Amino acid sequence: MTGADKRDSCGDRPKADRNLMSNKTISLTTSGGLIEGECDPKFDGVLQTFVENFEKRDELGASLCISLEGRTIVDLWGGKVAPGGAPWSRDTISVVFSATKGASALCAHMAADRGLLDFDAPVIRYWPAFGQAGKEAALTSMMLDHSVGLPHLRAPLKKGAFYDYDHMIGLLEREEPFWRPGTRNGYHGVTSAWTVGEMVHRSTGKRLGKFFRDEVATPLGIDFWIGLPAEHEPRVAPMIFAPVTDEVRNSRISQAATDEKDSATHYFMFNNGGFNPNSREAHAAEIGSATGISNARGLAGLYAPLANGGELNGLRLVSRDAVTRMSLCSIATHEDVTLRIPTRFSLGFMKAMDNRGLENAAHCSLIISDPAFGHVGAGGSIGFADPASRMSFGYTMNRMGFGILMNDRGQSLIDAAYRALGYRSDAGGVWIDSNR
């Protein structure tokens, strides 16, 4: 794994003012299998919730890592890599789907922080061929906050299109936007792999996967890959898809995808060129929106510097100003054009997604504190940084849950973490520090 022997992925810098105790070793047998790891006693509520996910919420295999002020306070894993399969081990990794977007966004912010990329500049300054079919005025920032108007492609994609980077770049260059860039907000579920990835490529001279490996994963010592080397394939837990129930069929996103044949939602759901997230082709491809492969330590380790002003253990990834930009909402809508729910994004990061108005989806929203930012992945994986509490959080799993991206397994762990910090829930959909 990348630098795994060099440093604890979640950091190891202690801070006395949190009154944290020494972590205790965990080894618990549940109905879903063995749970192992370590946990600070102050976060026993998080441990209990992790156990409940296996006992009550149909968890199969999962990992959870939380750091506070650079110190790992929760590091848990357990369950099975497949139904009836081997135990989920400390080094098991899995596809984190759109939680990859946070890693891609960080790369873009690093390029901007180095003066290589200007978020206020036209895209065509860096990528001239992008300025076709009504996209000539698009700004770089629009590529990051899902407002550029390319949530998907209309023409049927060839088999394996997502694995062919240059092919996808050419299609996006020629595609007419679904709306005038900057005027609406619609989740770019897969296409941001190439819109954001190519901005990193054009500004730094490195493809996204290589930039991430060289400038982020290796220096941090995290087990996180955008383009997985073949030798790590045996560690990957396959993703188990949620069954299609009547509740899923009757959801707003499913109804729109089925009934509105020329909508962004329809193309997002059905035009995927036979994409298979469990294939070696998907794992090897540098799809910076969807096929990052990691575990909870990798996700929490990615966000640990961002929860601490851009620096961890003497390694500075970005400036404090860059972290502030990541935290500030860039665009918000009451109905995302693609997802058909309220969403809020900063430049490249998700701030909130609100499923609370949907039937049987009260616990399938992303509810974090107002300064926090990160990204959810399909099925429920999640990573985020909270600069106010200096907490970083990572959760991965292999049995995908119901709901649009988020589900109650991941959100219940987030809720437990904030409660352990003394936060209280707000009806508006954020966690608030009770001590402030």
Predicted regions and their residues:
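Active-site-proximal alpha-helical segments within enzyme catalytic domains
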Residues: 145-146, 192-199, 286, 290-312, ...
